[in-house]
Amino acid sequence: MLQLTYDKEEMLIVIDKVVRKTMAMDLTWDWPCGVAYYGVSRAYTKTGNKEYLNMLVQWADEYIELGLPHWTVNTCAMGHMLITLYEETGDQKYWDIVMSKVDYIRNHALRFGDNVLQHTVSVANDFPEQAWADTLFMAAFFLLRVGTKLKDEEMIQDALNQYYWHIKYLQDPSSGFWYHGYNNVKQDHMSGFFWGRANAWGAYTMSQVKIHLKDWYLYPQCMDVECSLRDQLAALKGVQTENGLWRTVLDDEESYEEVSASCGIAAAMINNGNPLHTKYVQKALEGILNHISEDGRVLGVSGGTAVMKDRDGYRNIPKDWIQGWGQGLALAFLSDMLN
């Protein structure tokens, strides 16, 4: 556990502002909402504020009544919130939807190679045989949470297989950084940039494996997760900016600082628990708090980002609007600070 310095009361006030702004955004059942409400769920778990849980229940019940969309890898991100709702309320309808998403991932989602999940954002075959770092949060981490809860070894193995292959496909062994995506058809990383948020998806989800899988050391793939995260975080500390943040293209000093990536990376450092990272998390806290407005908006968050064609494609993604993933990753980080 890292020994971090912060004002707990101030932290609770900031979390409350971000939660309330997030719940007022009218997000729909897709991955931005999935990440956002994962963050709200974490805030509830860490603070015990029942009002946050009630907000989620009210939103979910209304949306379920209105009708749910088709499942994709991205829409499975909503499963994180549903796990919390089921655990806290015992209402079977939430768990039924969780298991519907699991059934989609296990039996219907597009895969390639050694059973690797293809990243999907719609019911179409959008990105044939492409692995994106995003998939780890939206599907693999979700599958791991359900598998460990049910003690379902096949599900756990499937989740860990996703981690293993995403590490092999996306991590650059020389730098330790992660590429945004991998194209199995062309056997390349497409434009080949180290996108900040991709590294946050990788680092954050890897930092969760030991937390959820108590006997992790009995699974060989977890050694890959442990070493991948070690090398990645060691590299990431070297490109933290003077403001305590990370850039949207990690190794490009002309690309802007991006707050959602910074939140995910700093949260991964907290969860990984290496005391050598204390000063980097402390610095990140200041930088992140400086980008949260009085009304709970997390600022400096890049818009939705495909695997762009060139460096300017990443540099020019707007960061003028609040986003569900920015709100959610900020809440995940701030909630982990309460440890």
Q: What does each model-identified segment do?
A:
Residues 177-197:
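Acidic/Ser/Thr-rich, low-complexity mid-to-C-terminal regulatory regions of eukaryotic proteins
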Residues 203-250:
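Oxyanion-binding "anion nests"
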Residues 89, 146-157, 209-223, 272-276:
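Inter-helical turn/loop segments and adjacent helix faces that build the functional surface
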Residues 2-32, 41-46, 51, 62, ...:
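CBM-like carbohydrate-recognition segments
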Residues 116-182:
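Aromatic- and glycine-enriched pocket-lining scaffold segments that form the walls
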